Amino acid sequence: MSRVPTPPPPGEMTSGPVAESWCYTQVKVVKFSYMWTINNFSFCREEMGEVVRSSTFSSGPNDKMKWCLRVNPKGLDDESKDYLSLYLLLVSCPKSEVRAKFKFSLLNAKREETKAMESQRAYRFVQGKDWGFKKFIRRDFLLDEANGLLPDDKLTLFCEVSVVQDSVNISGQSNTNMLKVPECQLSDDLGNLWEGSRFTDCSLFVGGQEFKAHKSILAARSPVFNAMFEHKMEESKKNRVDISDVEPDVFREMMVFIYTGKAPNLEKMADNLLAAADKYALERLKVLCEEALCNSLSVENVADVLILADLHSAEQLKAQAIDFINRCSVLRQLGCKDGKNWNSNHAADIMETAGWKAMIQSHPHLVAEAFRALASAQCTPFGLPRKRLKQS
């Protein structure tokens, strides 16, 4: 009787490439176990290489494949004379060969499995062939009563065998009406809505330029816009918002982020975009700007970045800027030469920049913060990557 092909499980058809035909190969594995107790173990033959064998066993009464366990109480050879050796032996088999994996363990006084060892692959057995472990367990550890492995002088071995049987191929054709769910295009669709200025209901005027937008989207994305339109403010009544402190190109980039969650030109305007993100409470955009500024910190700009971070409560960026200054200062004190990322002269260079000198006059509290942090800093290894900023 021929096997009727069955389709792949539904869970495997929901994603990825789709083929017109398919095949499943099922490798059949028969698993069974065997327990062997050796009474009066201490009276077993004490000569190296001598063998004690179990009775034969199989997976069931109708299985003609017979196995047994083989123990060398005092090891198999000189290399293993201080160990107990344990092997699985194929006694008889109707096939020319068979592949099997196995696992051995001991049962302690509480009948718990312990000292387990298992094969890392399926070994090839032929009749009369054995596989196992020459150094299964040290004899001194086994004979130590404190370890509880020989209660009443009984050694109990537990063996689990997994025998590879035949392989079965199941093949068939895919249904022609199989559904493929398209990828989500929400970001692209909203981006097209913004770019096309379709169905807009408000206008935003920035630097003499008009940007048409959708109040519902602005309100959903920005708590500041939400407050404008929710309460009966002038902007809500006239559907007009005048913005005077953001440059048009920066505002456009912010709007692209509001609609799509992306800011393709962020690297070019991270400082101004951070200010806009802070003003309109766009937390994720703000942290993305912080990350970009952290990655571009230098001797020339660190003071300006520190002022910017303080002005807009960008705490992660502020901490990274102070850390940059302090690393340079500590390296200079330690007399370090040029390293992979740091130069001992950077600290002096920072203090010579126009940004640092301006900060002393306009933001002296930031200078004080930097030196307080330096005073409490621990001397840890330098040159490590900065921590990635947490994004909201």
Curated annotation (Swiss-Prot):
Gene3D superfamilies attached here?
A: 6.10.250.3030, 6.20.250.50, Apoptosis, Tumor Necrosis Factor Receptor Associated Protein 2, Chain A (2.60.210.10), Potassium Channel Kv1.1, Chain A (3.30.710.10)
Entry annotated with the keyword Nucleus = yes
* Annotated SMART domains: BTB (SM00225), MATH (SM00061)
Tell where it localizes. Answer: Nucleus
Annotated pathway, please? Protein modification; protein ubiquitination
Keywords (A to Z) from UniProt: Nucleus, Ubl conjugation pathway
Transmembrane stretches in the record are: none
List cellular component terms (GO): Cul3-RING ubiquitin ligase complex; cytoplasm; nucleus
The biological processes this protein is annotated with in GO are: negative regulation of protein ubiquitination; proteasome-mediated ubiquitin-dependent protein catabolic process; protein ubiquitination; regulation of proteolysis
A GO molecular-function term, please? ubiquitin protein ligase binding
Domain (BTB) ranges: 200-267
Major localization listed first in the record, in broad terms: nucleus
> SUPFAM superfamilies recorded for this chain?
POZ domain (SSF54695), TRAF domain-like (SSF49599)
Tell me the ranges covered by the MATH domain, including all copies: 31-161
Q: Which family does it belong to?
A: Belongs to the Tdpoz family.
Q: What does this protein do?
A: Component of a cullin-RING-based BCR (BTB-CUL3-RBX1) E3 ubiquitin-protein ligase complex that mediates the ubiquitination and subsequent proteasomal degradation of target proteins, but with relatively low efficiency.
What is annotated about its quaternary structure and interactions? Answer: Homodimer. Heterodimer with SPOP. Component of cullin-RING-based BCR (BTB-CUL3-RBX1) E3 ubiquitin-protein ligase complexes containing homodimeric SPOPL or the heterodimer formed by SPOP and SPOPL.
Q: What is this protein called?
A: Speckle-type POZ protein-like B
Q: Which organism is it from?
A: Danio rerio (Zebrafish)
Write the gene name: spoplb
